[in-house]
UniProtKB/Swiss-Prot annotation:
Changing M430I: In q217; embryonic lethal. Residues 262-453 form the Helicase ATP-binding domain. Residues 48-70, 100-123, 630-647, 656-692 have a biased composition (Gly residues). GO terms for cellular component: canonical inflammasome complex; cell leading edge; cytoplasm; cytoplasmic stress granule; lamellipodium; nucleus; P granule; plasma membrane. Residues 699-708 have a biased composition (Polar residues). This is ATP-dependent RNA helicase laf-1. Keywords: ATP-binding, Cell membrane, Cell projection, Cytoplasm, Helicase, Hydrolase, Inflammasome, Membrane, Nucleotide-binding, Nucleus, RNA-binding, Transcription, Transcription regulation, Translation regulation. Residues 465-626 form the Helicase C-terminal domain. Its EC number is 3.6.4.13. It catalyses: ATP + H2O = ADP + phosphate + H(+). Residues 1-191, 623-708 are annotated as: Disordered. The gene is laf-1. Gene3D superfamilies: P-loop containing nucleotide triphosphate hydrolases.
Amino acid sequence: MESNQSNNGGSGNAALNRGGRYVPPHLRGGDGGAAAAASAGGDDRRGGAGGGGYRRGGGNSGGGGGGGYDRGYNDNRDDRDNRGGSGGYGRDRNYEDRGYNGGGGGGGNRGYNNNRGGGGGGYNRQDRGDGGSSNFSRGGYNNRDEGSDNRGSGRSYNNDRRDNGGDGQNTRWNNLDAPPSRGTSKWENRGARDERIEQELFSGQLSGINFDKYEEIPVEATGDDVPQPISLFSDLSLHEWIEENIKTAGYDRPTPVQKYSIPALQGGRDLMSCAQTGSGKTAAFLVPLVNAILQDGPDAVHRSVTSSGGRKKQYPSALVLSPTRELSLQIFNESRKFAYRTPITSALLYGGRENYKDQIHKLRLGCHILIATPGRLIDVMDQGLIGMEGCRYLVLDEADRMLDMGFEPQIRQIVECNRMPSKEERITAMFSATFPKEIQLLAQDFLKENYVFLAVGRVGSTSENIMQKIVWVEEDEKRSYLMDLLDATGDSSLTLVFVETKRGASDLAYYLNRQNYEVVTIHGDLKQFEREKHLDLFRTGTAPILVATAVAARGLDIPNVKHVINYDLPSDVDEYVHRIGRTGRVGNVGLATSFFNDKNRNIARELMDLIVEANQELPDWLEGMSGDMRSGGGYRGRGGRGNGQRFGGRDHRYQGGSGNGGGGNGGGGGFGGGGQRSGGGGGFQSGGGGGRQQQQQQRAQPQQDWWS
């Protein structure tokens, strides 16, 4: 192989001092000192104009003419010295197998200023042949920035081929940010495989899904003309790329929430889905969302726009809102899984100063699916970096808490005040483990009138796959009792301990550490990198005990949690449902232990109903306390046993009447009649996970205090 010295085409003095201008050492030619910036050499570190090659990548043999800097590294220098020659021939493994600038021109009219690369050469990514035959248009690779100054004269994407590269390619899908071209707008070329990314995305545990348990879970779907549920993913008309990603992810067959949600969303229906975390609801909205964007193609993508001030505004096709950083990150990683090797890109926005610049940088690379917390999203929209005009799909995850925890004004601002298509023009989906009536009424403001309501039985209640233990523990005995439980569980199992306050989480974790337990904590006062680090230590079992506040742990899907301990019981039984759902995931067996004392009397009756419904052991003292409250009239709960507690909510539209499909909008009862009537609610009911039996059922008038 020729040395870089032989590619110089100029003297060492010329490399060090071009016309009296000092050349920094890191831009010089390495061993010979003269291979960096001589008139014929270019920057041998960057594989630039003329003969210099990227030395570690094999070099550009056969150097061309009059050099200059490939990327200029102007740093306030004059652009005039940055015009290069014709470039070398990109044989052999240039720039780590990517053939960078092989065969292209030199460092054109713009140098490194404003992150613009050289004017010459194509970026023949993954190719081993000649480089692109035409120059970049006003700029080069630009650090993966897909701005309007970076498009070449041609737009073919030579995907992992070993022949000649296409003209001027500079991004993976260089027509995403360009006006649609009839010949290249079908996204026909799938991206190359990347073993490292595959290991990152698909190595997580999915084999632990207990589908036999899932088949026992009851499902109710209400609304007019509810789409038929599916039994297999092959029942859907999915794009072949996402079908392959589903198989690669190890999904054997759809879970109950997926069987009903995916066909409803594919059919253009809005959806309110009541399903517990861990039931597969993230895939239930991501699969139809990614599939729709793929099938719509780039012609339907709202192009990004660069303002006069140089700011680039992205217009996502889909928006997913969630209440916490961790849940947003979890959804983002799942979206990457289903969009793997497709032209679809996801972006992530959540609060915290330490990640802001990185989030904005990645956002500028392109965004079809945006996953965000409401506050950070509003901040970025106020800066003119995000527009909602092209958003055709809206998802609210953990919607009950989003609407109940003070996020409602922010959600309204995002949806109603930023030119987002109206609810009649978009598809909206809401998912949560519970949907009380008041939240349903609030959610209707964002949904079309004919939305589908889906109620999936609690995984861990009706399936009896979570053993629930309620124990009486006085406040001053909690730490001692907790350590007894931890010792009994052992280090081989993951244990999640819930407390009510951030201070309580820190104090308890500190105490357990002093007692030689491997423990970490997450709460709102920790920085984001600390929270992510602690979660990783917990997931991997390095620290098998996690002490968390409920808000910080909202929606987290952590496999293999064997034991959930409610060190502090919540004041709301719905929150109790969210918490115990962290164990017994995807149909597997788990244990939930709750410390109860006089402070928790307000939830005694509802807690008893849940225990009875799940056929769990009911302590005599809890039954007696609940009976005293019921007879004394001192508590207004949600109703007695058997009134649907096995679901996290029932469609309020069909709770107001009884009989066989009575008249009036929403006044009729039952699941009979299908779409043959104007009032009432046609739908499906299944005693198992997604059967197709359509039934007619009479409903008794619910107790008055059911939704109180």
